[in-house]
Design a protein with these regions (language model features):
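Multi-pass membrane proteins that catalyze or facilitate reactions on polyprenyl-/lipid-phosphate substrates
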Residues: 2-24, 30-305
Length: 305
């Protein structure tokens, strides 16, 4: 973890968190993918993992400074602030764009995810049968998740708690969208409505589930990255590649739902061949790919500095 950051650095961290939050609002795009793109993924996992019995004991015994430093709190607070700002400010905008300009939005994210798959794969030091197999397995798992059918589920607070715990684990996995997991659990639009209408009980229970889920799962992921780095990165890159099925821009609606305002919106969709806005879509794909390329080069330059 970097020892010293200035105010400008923390401002950039907030912006990176906003990128993660914007991605997490979209079913099919992972905040974990954005964390990988902007170069904060492993620090994020390690920082979350550091929230444990030892650091919590420091907090409750008044050793605030030790607790703050131990969990890399300045970093975490910046990221969480960015995610929160993005979710509450962009939720309405992104859901509007997905309804009225879906091809253009998905095209941009398709370029982002495709480029991310390539650049994350470059982090694998040695390709062999183990990493290739891990890459394929990750891709198959992600593809299967994208074609699964959404379930009919209850809306009680216990289930909302479980949804928070499960979705947050997906959110920190590149290529596995926490929002799409909520779609499969039948609760994406329910949670989005809770955010837009500021339904405090539902949001608090969901956040509590997310807090438990992320602190538990981050330990597993941190261990895997430390002990089996190449295999873990291969699985994560496979997740990204497999998720491209979900972010393919051209779709036809198979099943719809009616939201709380009486508007009919798509729930289950199938991919089709490009049939409209082709050049605009290609342009946005190139833009998405180019942004990742630029961020990768920027990251390499700052690492060498």
């Amino acid at each position: 973890m970097p020892n010293k950051r200035n105010l400008k650095d923390y401002g950039f961290l907030v912006l990176k968190g906003m990128g993660m939050g914007a991605a997490d609002v979209v079913p099919g795009v992972s905040g974990g993918t954005i964390a990988f793109i902007v170069g904060i993924y492993e620090e994020l996992i390690d920082s979350i993992k550091s929230i444990n019995g030892t650091t919590l004991k420091q907090l409750f015994t008044g050793k605030i400074a030790a607790f703050w430093k131990g969990i890399n709190a300045n970093f975490l607070l910046s990221i969480v602030a960015g995610i929160g700002i993005s979710i509450f400010s962009l939720a309405k905008i992104i859901t509007y764009l997905l309804v009225y300009h879906p091809i253009l939005v998905w095209s941009f994210f398709f370029g982002l995810v495709l480029a991310s798959t390539w650049f994350v794969s470059k982090d694998i030091k040695q390709w062999n049968w183990k990493t290739i197999l891990s890459f394929v397995v990750g891709g198959v798992i992600a593809f299967y998740i994208t074609v699964a059918t959404p379930a009919e589920t209850p809306s009680n607070l216990l289930f909302i708690f479980l949804c928070g715990a499960i979705a947050i684990c997906a959110m920190i996995l590149p290529g596995i969208s926490g929002s799409f997991i909520l779609v499969l659990l039948g609760k994406y639009f329910y949670i989005m409505e809770a955010v837009k209408t500021f339904n405090v009980p539902v949001m608090l229970v969901f956040i509590a589930g997310a807090a438990i889920g992320i602190t538990t799962f981050s330990r597993v992921l941190s261990f895997a990255l430390r002990k089996f780095h190449d295999i873990t990165i291969a699985v994560l890159a496979g997740f990204m590649l497999g998720s491209l099925n979900k972010v393919w821009p051209w779709k036809e609606t198979i099943e719809t739902y009616v939201d709380s305002h009486g508007m009919t919106k798509p729930l289950v969709e199938a991919n089709i061949a490009p049939n409209q806005f082709v050049w605009e879509a290609v342009g946005l794909m190139i833009l998405g790919f180019g942004i990742v390329y630029f961020l990768e080069k920027l990251s390499q330059k700052s690492t060498k500095a």
